[in-house]
């Protein structure tokens, strides 16, 4: 009887360890061992969707810090914001969306010159460019991505153009990440 109980306990512990390992795989694989978790916060919300169904959302926000990780693509006055939205269904299938936003600090002369070029009809990355999907990157808002990010609770601050989005890919739905 004791042997059976011990075997069941070992199996249960392996199952729990495996389940937790799968949750943390993305963090460990992507960020590696040089990451420090600065803060972690979990909130629980109950909402009603458009069809009237009641949905419980448990949102976990992690703020992590990784030092001296320059991919060799950033200039002196540039900042990269990476936003990941990972949607997992009950079967374990994942859909991963990664958005990279490169922010450049421009001088007033450069900004004025960009607006003149944009008004003349030329393409300008910092000017009011409207892509094929209909959102303006000048305003820093992507309605198609931001709604997915808010629904998943990850990084909508970066998509909303506040500059306060999710530094390492995680942030609160309010954009309160770093």
Swiss-Prot record:
The keyword Cell membrane does not apply. Core component of the silk filament; a strong, insoluble and chemically inert fiber. Residues 149-178 are annotated as: Highly repetitive. The gene is FIBH. Pfam families: Fib-H_N. Keywords: Disulfide bond, Repeat, Signal, Silk protein. Produced exclusively in the posterior (PSG) section of silk glands, which are essentially modified salivary glands. Composed of antiparallel beta sheets. The strands of the beta sheets run parallel to the fiber axis. Long stretches of silk fibroin are composed of microcrystalline arrays of (-Gly-Ser-Gly-Ala-Gly-Ala-)n interrupted by regions containing bulkier residues. The fiber is composed of microcrystalline arrays alternating with amorphous regions. The interchain disulfide bridge is essential for the intracellular transport and secretion of fibroin. This is Fibroin heavy chain. Residues 1-21 form the signal peptide. InterPro entries: Fib-H_N (IPR049375), Fib-H_N_sf (IPR049376). It comes from the Eukaryota. It comes from Bombyx mandarina (Wild silk moth). Silk fibroin elementary unit consists in a disulfide-linked heavy and light chain and a p25 glycoprotein in molar ratios of 6:6:1. This results in a complex of approximately 2.3 MDa.
């Amino acid at each position: 009887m004791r042997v059976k109980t011990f075997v069941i306990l070992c199996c249960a512990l392996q199952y729990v360890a495996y389940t937790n390992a799968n949750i943390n795989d993305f963090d460990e694989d992507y960020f590696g061992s040089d990451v420090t978790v600065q803060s972690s916060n979990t909130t629980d919300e109950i909402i009603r969707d458009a069809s009237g169904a009641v949905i419980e959302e448990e949102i976990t926000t992690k703020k992590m810090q990784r030092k001296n990780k320059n991919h060799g693509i950033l200039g002196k006055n540039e900042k990269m914001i990476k936003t990941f939205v990972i949607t997992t269904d009950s079967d374990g299938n994942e859909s991963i969306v990664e958005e990279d936003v490169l922010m450049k600090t421009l001088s007033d002369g450069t900004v004025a010159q960009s607006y003149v070029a944009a008004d003349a009809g030329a393409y300008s990355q910092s000017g009011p460019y409207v892509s094929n999907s209909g959102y303006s990157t000048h305003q820093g808002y992507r309605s198609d991505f931001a709604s997915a990010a808010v629904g998943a609770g990850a990084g909508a601050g970066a998509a909303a153009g506040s500059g306060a989005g999710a530094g390492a890919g995680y942030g609160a739905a309010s954009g309160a990440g770093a």
